[in-house]
């Protein structure tokens, strides 16, 4: 094997990309250098970042920070509903997010007269979702249909919601 020697030595900040927030805390949290985790994502990633923050607090790690740019799917949908230039008749709601939020999080969709179907990501799941939305629209109905019952409950993942609400405070990013 041939290993190239770097021509320049870089001694500045180190950046690494990790998909698990606990890794940043476990590997770098006690290294003596400032660790800044950029928390990106929706309800599916937010609970793990919240858990890392609480773990850092419990362990007394003071060099671990989070720059959170998390978003919430229900608020994104609300913004789409409230935009007067958009005329969206229905929504296919993401199953992975809905596992956390539950069906209940989408109650504003039928209140706005729009169809909504929660689906998984398999092709047949998506087709069932589109069919469900079309049937609602043809019947003049507006409801939240859970077509992903094998994973999504009405109330969602309450422990995940609790940890998110303990650590993060929703703010408007307009």
Give the positions of each predicted feature.
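Glycine-rich oxoanion-binding loops at beta->alpha junctions
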Residues: 2-29, 73-74
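A generic structural signal for alpha->beta connector loops
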Residues: 11, 32, 61-63, 87-88, ...
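Conserved beta-strand scaffold positions in the cores of enzyme catalytic domains, especially
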Residues: 14, 66, 116-118
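Buried hydrophobic packing segments
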Residues: 20-24, 48-56, 77-80, 109, ...
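Membrane-interface helix-loop-helix junctions at boundaries between adjacent transmembrane segments
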Residues: 26-38, 52
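Phosphate/pyrophosphate-binding betaalpha-module
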Residues: 38, 42-105
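A conserved active-site cap/scaffold subdomain adjacent to cofactor or substrate pockets
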Residues: 85-154
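Active-site loops and adjacent core secondary-structure elements that bind or stabilize anionic groups
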Residues: 143-174
């Amino acid at each position: 094997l041939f290993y190239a020697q770097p021509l320049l030595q870089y001694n500045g900040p180190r950046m690494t990309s990790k998909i698990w927030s606990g890794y940043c805390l476990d590997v770098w949290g006690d290294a003596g250098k400032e660790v800044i985790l950029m928390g990106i994502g929706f309800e599916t990633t937010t609970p793990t970042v919240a858990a890392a923050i609480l773990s850092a607090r419990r362990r007394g790690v003071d060099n671990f920070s989070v720059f959170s740019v998390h978003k919430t799917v229900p608020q994104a949908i609300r913004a789409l509903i409230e935009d007067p230039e958009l005329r969206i008749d229905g929504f296919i709601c993401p199953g992975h997010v809905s596992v956390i939020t539950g069906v209940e999080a989408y109650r504003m969709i039928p209140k706005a007269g729009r169809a909504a179907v929660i689906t998984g990501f398999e092709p047949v799941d998506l087709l069932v979702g589109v069919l469900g939305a079309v049937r609602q629209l043809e019947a003049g109905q507006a409801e939240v249909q859970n077509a992903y019952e094998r994973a999504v409950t009405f109330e969602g993942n309450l422990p995940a919601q609790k940890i998110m609400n303990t650590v993060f405070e929703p703010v408007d990013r307009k």
